[in-house]
Amino acid sequence: MTGTVTSVRQPPEWAAVTIVAAGQRMDARGWVPATAGNISVRLPDDTIAITSSGNHKGFLKTSDIMVVDQAGKPLTPGLKPSAETLLHCQIYRLDNQAGAVVHGHSVAATVLSMAPGKNDAPPDFIRLEGYEVLKAFGVKTHQITLDLPILDNDQDMERLASIAEPILLRGAPLGYLIRGHGVYVWGGDMAAALARLEGLEFLLACELERRRLR
């Protein structure tokens, strides 16, 4: 990886256009209500193009996309990064194959993360098994169990990142979920990240409906 870049930067057009299109797609699916969510891509010099704070993802303009360095320091004047930028930076730092990160706030993800588990205690994961769409995550069969980790929400991003780090180091094939908040999913490029998000959201919607039918 290259060292931290400190020069003033504007995102390349391809990166900004890619992020804007991803925001429109996520908004159309109801995964980023109000100004929720954030979207990023890794740039060739290992800086990160990411949505700036406070923008509705369905109405993004390329001028809403900024560049940060590997520590989350803004390099684009006049734009403020989301506090959650640190979580994007962490994923890129710990997974050299990650080329894009998407974070959404769907109803299914939010509700399931807060559903009571055994003895009414909040669960640490959502177990997904038997679904054909699990193959979207690189497995060869539906006859497998994958767990989606759930982290307790925290407004202190450094503390939240410290909780996420061991999960990322062990490997998180589905991504991870922040309780009452939303999912983080990533892939080699934006198309892969969005496909994984779509697969995960389908699985969570199925799981929510299955629990209703119990």
Curated annotation (Swiss-Prot):
It comes from the Bacteria. SMART domains: Aldolase_II. One of its GO terms (molecular function) is methylthioribulose 1-phosphate dehydratase activity. GO terms for cellular component: cytosol. The keyword Zinc applies. Its cofactor is Zn(2+). Pathway: Amino-acid biosynthesis; L-methionine biosynthesis via salvage pathway; L-methionine from S-methyl-5-thio-alpha-D-ribose 1-phosphate: step 2/6. Binds 1 zinc ion per subunit. Catalyzes the dehydration of methylthioribulose-1-phosphate (MTRu-1-P) into 2,3-diketo-5-methylthiopentyl-1-phosphate (DK-MTP-1-P). HAMAP family: Salvage_MtnB. This is Methylthioribulose-1-phosphate dehydratase.
